[in-house]
């Protein structure tokens, strides 16, 4: 298996783990791998009147996770979220951008409301 295929597989596994974690904490997954012209959102989750657009990063070690999220990636998620809000945001009061950090054999880390825009 080449590197790209392995990375894709690892990413999909991380997204499944993140979705599982969110469900255990009361979230309902309403979308996954949703693409727009502006970017892609890994998971869209809703709990009550809160809607979260979730970027999932999966790495094999802590050092890789530390550099996995940057302003450019968050800006793309925020742009995609803005485009998707009319479809998924009906009846919500709070909208936020979250990040899930996933490592093998470790508890996922859920960072909430990480993007505040410019």
From Swiss-Prot:
GO molecular function ontology, one term from the record: nucleic acid binding
Domain of life (superkingdom): Bacteria
InterPro entries linked to this entry: Restrct_endonuc-II-like, tRNA_endonuc-like_dom_sf, UPF0102_YraN-like
Pfam families for this protein: UPF0102
HAMAP family (alphabetical): UPF0102 (MF_00048)
PANTHER family given in the database record: UPF0102 PROTEIN YRAN
UniProt similarity note: Belongs to the UPF0102 family.
Name the record gives this protein: UPF0102 protein Swit_0572
Organism listed in the record: Rhizorhabdus wittichii (strain DSM 6014 / CCUG 31198 / JCM 15750 / NBRC 105917 / EY 4224 / RW1) (Sphingomonas wittichii)
